[in-house]
Amino acid sequence: MRPESFNAFHEAIRFGAGHCPPDLFDGSVPAIVRGLKVHANNIAHARHVALEETYPRLLRAMDPGAFHEAAEQFLDQPHVVSLSLDALGEGFERYLEEASFRDLARAEWRWLEAFHAAEAEALTLADLASLQPDALLAARLRLHPATRWLVLEEPEAFDWDWQIAGDGEVLLLSRPDAEVLLRRVDAEAASILSALSRSRPVVRLLGADLPALITLIDAGTIVLESVRED
């Protein structure tokens, strides 16, 4: 299908047969309308299923009727209509009334982002210990591509598939290897994460909270970007 024909087809699916050029389909207008309705229903169903598969924990936690009502509102938004199925779901939490459900939705979306992020070798404490002092101070660090975090609205109510280690109001997601890991961290750790959103020399982190930094390294959230070669 030519690009202009595809665009016209897309407009007809979204807004009805009145937006369909007369030469796009063969047959009578009623037949075209029936065909478009069937296709539109199939697309709508597929988008609902995609949202359910994006948020399986949320779907289990919520009343199904409330989930689908929020899904209907979300999927009807103009900026959402044009998204492909694999990009569907970001921002869904804004259509949820309860804070605990918003936390869960944001966590599930960040889990997907972490899972699909680029590969990288996570920094370890052994890596740092192997560096000479001058090289260590000159080394640059940045976040692992899979690192994600969010501040929970209701930390005490947050629930996942398994017990999450750590304390604090910040949920940290990392993927140093194949598995996405979750743990709770505090505001000091979140401050370090924010600082490492851009490449930073180790010397700029000398004032950081050391236990928090060690926690982040152990979680596989940081990569060694460069080391000065002598």
Predicted regions mapped to residue ranges:
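Long, charge-rich, low-complexity alpha-helical segments
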Residues: 1-132, 178, 183-230
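Short aromatic-glycine motifs in intrinsically disordered, low-complexity regions
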Residues: 134-136
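Low-complexity, glycine/alanine/valine/leucine- and proline-rich hydrophobic stretches
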Residues: 140-198
